[in-house]
């Protein structure tokens, strides 16, 4: 066994190496035009929706491998991630390769991090912490918007948090598309549970009102400690989705995002100026870059 491979096995045994650890896992090699990598043969998120994501290693630096089937999804994710390479708050694409069956994305690894779905399930969030998370999320989404893209699948599973620094990163750009503010969209590429009511009722949506809706859904679910997430069907059934343990302005923000009538929903550009976030701009530092600086790696 080579020394890099031995180092990688130590990474896999480290309890801080994400929340799924496999001490006896096998390791395989994979080569690109630039580097030799070692990759775990068992998914990081076994049994979930991300059984195509694996932990890897290159010269002492942990990385993440994501396999995307060429039969199911075209290579748009690579194009989008390259375009967003220097965007604060967006997970970095380090390198890309492919084989006959898969697009293979090699992505930065954020140590001591977890997705927001598991974070809010296992930790009861106080309003101030949840508010800071939501505010960061909005800033990142607007950064993506400024680059001419819409993520298309904003949900707590696609947001990871550095547990120590409380800094957010957006991941999984498989549903991202070019921004088109004026034309209705008839195909839903994101997660059905986060679909907006206009698509449910009429079969179309506009990108920005959909984004506001999904932000509202994430905001609701951040307060769902040890409980299943709320989704559109729960709201349409008339269930009370407004958290009890937040301020009136917090409740109003969620209500404004989750208004059934898209024309009365909070505007995309008005998100950061909502009264709930008053004074937060001074408190939140600019979104810092986590992990290794991989700028200009992708050409």
Swiss-Prot record:
Catalytic reaction equation(s): L-seryl-[protein] + ATP = O-phospho-L-seryl-[protein] + ADP + H(+); L-threonyl-[protein] + ATP = O-phospho-L-threonyl-[protein] + ADP + H(+)
Gene3D superfamilies documented for this protein: Transferase(Phosphotransferase) domain 1
Any GO BP: viral process
Domain Protein kinase: 39-277
Keywords: ATP-binding, Host cytoplasm, Kinase, Nucleotide-binding, Serine/threonine-protein kinase, Transferase, Virion
Induction conditions: Expressed in the late phase of the viral replicative cycle.
Residues that bind ATP: 45-53, 66
Annotated compartments: Virion; Host cytoplasm
EC number: 2.7.11.1
SUPFAM superfamilies: Protein kinase-like (PK-like)
Domain of life from the UniProt record: Viruses
Record: active site: 153 (proton acceptor)
GO cellular component: a single term: virion component
Pfam families: Pkinase
Record GO terms (molecular function): ATP binding; protein serine kinase activity; protein serine/threonine kinase activity
Its job: Essential for viral replication. It may mediate the virus progression through DNA replication.
Family named by the database record: Belongs to the protein kinase superfamily. Ser/Thr protein kinase family.
The protein's name: Serine/threonine-protein kinase 1
């Amino acid at each position: 066994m080579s020394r890099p491979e031995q180092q990688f096995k130590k990474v896999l045994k480290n309890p801080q190496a994400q929340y799924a650890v496999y001490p006896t896992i096998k390791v395989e090699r994979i080569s690109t035009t630039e580097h030799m990598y070692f990759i775990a043969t068992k998914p990081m998120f076994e049994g979930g929706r991300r059984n195509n994501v694996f932990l890897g290693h290159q010269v002492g630096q942990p990385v993440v491998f994501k396999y995307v089937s060429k039969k199911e999804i075209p290579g748009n994710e690579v194009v989008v991630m390259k375009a967003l390479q220097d965007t604060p708050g967006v997970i970095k694409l380090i390198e890309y390769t492919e084989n006959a069956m898969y697009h293979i994305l090699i992505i930065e690894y954020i140590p001591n991090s977890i997705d927001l779905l598991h974070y809010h399930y296992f930790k009861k969030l106080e309003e101030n912490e949840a508010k800071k998370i939501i505010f960061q999320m909005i800033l990142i989404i607007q950064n993506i918007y400024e680059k001419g893209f819409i993520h298309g699948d904003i949900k707590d599973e696609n947001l990871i948090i550095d547990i120590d620094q409380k800094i957010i990163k957006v991941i999984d750009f498989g549903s991202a598309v070019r921004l088109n503010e004026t034309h209705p969209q008839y195909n839903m590429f994101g997660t059905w549970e986060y679909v907006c009511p206009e698509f449910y009722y009429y079969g179309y949506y506009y990108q920005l009102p959909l984004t506001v809706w999904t932000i509202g859904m994430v905001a609701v679910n951040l307060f769902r400690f040890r409980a299943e997430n709320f989704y559109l069907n729960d709201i349409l059934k008339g269930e009370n989705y407004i958290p009890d343990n937040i301020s009136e302005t917090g409740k109003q923000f969620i209500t404004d995002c989750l208004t059934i009538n898209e024309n009365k929903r909070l505007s995309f550009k008005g998100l950061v100026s909502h009264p709930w976030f008053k004074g937060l701009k001074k408190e939140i530092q600019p979104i810092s870059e986590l992990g290794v600086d991989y700028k200009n790696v992708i050409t």
